[in-house]
């Protein structure tokens, strides 16, 4: 065991009668997800000593971080990215989204399985596989995971110039990302693909974590509920997001349903330039509207991939305009 400050507290806490036994693995995560096991804070602290001041014993006698503290969550992410993905430098502005990495990794792995399902169950790997990350943010989570696990190259877009500046610093400070992640600013806040997707560009898949809420008030109310569940009974009228997030990352007009519906509409113009369009869908109630939009644009194939992280269930919807014959030609040309 590491000799860090909380160790004595840990030893005392471990003798508590209310010591709780947790399962060794988190239920529901993808088999290839590196985060299936419970966090090994000893190992993470070796990789990232900056994490140590944020470690403390829980009421159940375990060591953890305060997930209601944005700085603690940010430092945990920094440690995870360094320990599992070899990211030496990672920093984001204080008000940027700091996503839970296990769930983001699940999206990437299930997306890899989606591609494999069209390639004889073999995951296409390497720099020839190009993905478009809509809303890459300052954190660059999807490109970091996709490059490390499968060698894919990414184009990341965002409307926030400050987020992109932070993302560019992450890219410049990590050699593995320099030639595998290209960043573009979406200058039209009402557009998704238009303006950042050149006519001759082809992508094997797109991915997106769309803004969840329809207003700033709705986003704040959700944060208050989350903090209450984490045991923070006194919550401010404008609470600080424990996972951060600027307005453009958390809400937009029409919320998740409106954003993804616009994405579906725009995807028609790129129908022959992409194999699979995909987007996370957090609300199950959003699905009927998205299915309706996909029927309207006559998508050839639509799939819904369910994912689970413990008790939380999410999914992403994938659609393609390529016929089976066109899919086979795409695979032969780009994935062989």
Swiss-Prot record:
Keyword check for Cytoplasm: yes
Coiled-coil annotated residue ranges, if any: none
GO terms, molecular function: 23S rRNA (adenine(1618)-N(6))-methyltransferase activity
Keywords: Cytoplasm, Methyltransferase, rRNA processing, S-adenosyl-L-methionine, Transferase
Enzyme Commission identifier(s): 2.1.1.181
Catalytic activity: adenosine(1618) in 23S rRNA + S-adenosyl-L-methionine = N(6)-methyladenosine(1618) in 23S rRNA + S-adenosyl-L-homocysteine + H(+)
InterPro entries: METTL16/RlmF (IPR010286), rRNA_lsu_MeTfrase_F (IPR016909), SAM-dependent_MTases_sf (IPR029063)
Highest taxon of the lineage: Bacteria
One BP annotation, GO: rRNA base methylation
Pfam families: Methyltransf_10 (PF05971)
Localization per record: Cytoplasm
CDD domains: AdoMet_MTases
GO terms under cellular component: cytoplasm
PANTHER family the record matches: RNA N6-ADENOSINE-METHYLTRANSFERASE METTL16, SAM-DEPENDENT METHYLTRANSFERASE
NCBIfam families, alphabetized: PRK11727.1
Name under which the protein is recorded: Ribosomal RNA large subunit methyltransferase F
Classification lineage: Bacteria, Pseudomonadati, Pseudomonadota, Gammaproteobacteria, Enterobacterales
């Amino acid at each position: 065991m590491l000799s860090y400050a909380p160790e004595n507290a840990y030893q005392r806490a471990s003798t508590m009668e209310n010591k709780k036994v947790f399962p060794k693995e988190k239920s529901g995560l993808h088999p290839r997800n590196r985060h299936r096991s419970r966090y090994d804070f000893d190992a993470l602290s070796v990789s990232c000593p900056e994490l140590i001041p944020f470690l403390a014993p829980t009421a159940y006698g375990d060591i953890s971080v305060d997930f209601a503290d944005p700085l603690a969550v940010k430092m945990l992410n920094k440690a995870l990215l360094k320990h599992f993905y070899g990211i030496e430098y990672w920093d984001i502005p204080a008000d940027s989204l700091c996503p839970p990495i296990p769930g983001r990794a699940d999206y990437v792995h299930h997306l890899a399985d989606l591609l494999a399902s069209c390639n004889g169950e073999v995951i296409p790997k390497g720099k020839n596989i190009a993905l478009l990350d809509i809303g890459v943010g300052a954190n660059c989570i999807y490109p970091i995971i996709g490059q490390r696990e499968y060698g894919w190259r990414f184009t990341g877009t965002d409307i926030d110039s400050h987020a992109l500046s932070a993302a560019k610093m992450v890219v410049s400070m990590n050699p593995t990302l320099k030639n595998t992640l290209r960043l573009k600013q979406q200058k039209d806040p009402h557009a998704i693909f238009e303006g950042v997707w050149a006519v001759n560009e082809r992508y094997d898949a797109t991915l997106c974590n769309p803004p969840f809420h329809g207003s700033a008030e709705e986003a704040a109310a959700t944060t208050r509920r989350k903090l209450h569940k984490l045991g923070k009974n006194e919550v401010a009228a404008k609470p600080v997001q424990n996972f951060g997030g600027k307005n453009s990352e958390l809400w937009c007009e029409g919320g998740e349903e409106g954003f993804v519906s616009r994405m579906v509409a725009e995807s028609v113009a790129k129908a022959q330039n992409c194999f699979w369009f995909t987007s996370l869908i957090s609300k199950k109630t959003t699905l009927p509207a998205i299915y309706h939009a996909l029927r309207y644009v006559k998508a050839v194939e639509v799939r819904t991939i369910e994912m689970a992280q413990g008790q939380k269930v999410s999914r992403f919807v994938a659609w393609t305009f390529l016929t089976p014959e066109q899919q086979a030609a795409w695979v032969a040309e780009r994935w062989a």
